[in-house]
Amino acid sequence: MAKEQQVQANDLQEKLIAVNRVAK
């Protein structure tokens, strides 16, 4: 379960980074 949560967190972080790039 811990690994799944870690993967989800990484996926969210990547999405946030992508959104930030688009915002800029």
Swiss-Prot record:
One of its GO terms (molecular function) is rRNA binding. Signal peptide: none annotated. GO terms for cellular component: ribonucleoprotein complex; ribosome. Keywords: Ribonucleoprotein, Ribosomal protein, RNA-binding, rRNA-binding. The N-terminal domain interacts with the head of the 30S subunit; the C-terminal domain interacts with the body and contacts protein S4. The interaction surface between S4 and S5 is involved in control of translational fidelity. Belongs to the universal ribosomal protein uS5 family. With S4 and S12 plays an important role in translational accuracy. Located at the back of the 30S subunit body where it stabilizes the conformation of the head with respect to the body. Part of the 30S ribosomal subunit. Contacts proteins S4 and S8. This is Small ribosomal subunit protein uS5. It comes from Vibrio proteolyticus.
